[in-house]
From Swiss-Prot:
It holds the Pfam family Ribosomal_L20. Disulfide bonds: none annotated. One of its GO terms (cellular component) is ribosome. One of its GO terms (molecular function) is rRNA binding. The gene is rplT. PROSITE patterns: RIBOSOMAL_L20. Binds directly to 23S ribosomal RNA and is necessary for the in vitro assembly process of the 50S ribosomal subunit. It is not involved in the protein synthesizing functions of that subunit. PANTHER family: 39S RIBOSOMAL PROTEIN L20 (PTHR10986). The keyword RNA-binding applies. Belongs to the bacterial ribosomal protein bL20 family. This is Large ribosomal subunit protein bL20. Keywords: Ribonucleoprotein, Ribosomal protein, RNA-binding, rRNA-binding.
Length: 120
């Protein structure tokens, strides 16, 4: 009896993997064995870094808000506390954008937070 190799399916699987490795350099895009390892690592890194991206952006927003607050004489943590007490519900992403692109609007929010904090 002849040996069954499942050749069509194996070829399809290898072809798909090499197609996914297009754009990689050298033998990582040409040879199945190296392409398989390269794809495994690429997928591992992309999964991991999708999680890290969220942390990095949050840290960036906090740094930008902190810089804008310190320029106006208050620390980041005091400013966030003042915002909460004043009942201003603007997220960090928007605050960071305002601090960088529209400083007049950030000044208004800062003033509101400061007044709201003094009132309570």
């Amino acid at each position: 009896m002849a040996r069954a190799t499942n050749a069509p399916q194996s070829r399809k699987r290898r072809k798909r993997l090499l197609r996914d490795a297009r754009g990689f350099r050298g033998r990582r895009s040409k040879l199945f064995r190296y392409a398989k390892d390269a794809l495994y690592k690429a997928r591992y890194w992309s999964y991991r870094d999708r999680k890290n991206r969220k942390r990095e952006f949050r840290a960036l927003w906090i740094q930008r808000i902190n810089a804008a607050c310190r320029k106006r004489g208050m620390t980041y943590s005091r400013f966030m506390e003042a915002l909460r007490k004043a009942g201003i519900g603007v997220n960090r992403k928007m605050l960071a954008e305002l601090a960088v692109r529209s400083q007049e609007d950030f000044d208004q929010i800062f003033k509101l937070a400061k007044e709201g904090n003094l009132a309570s």
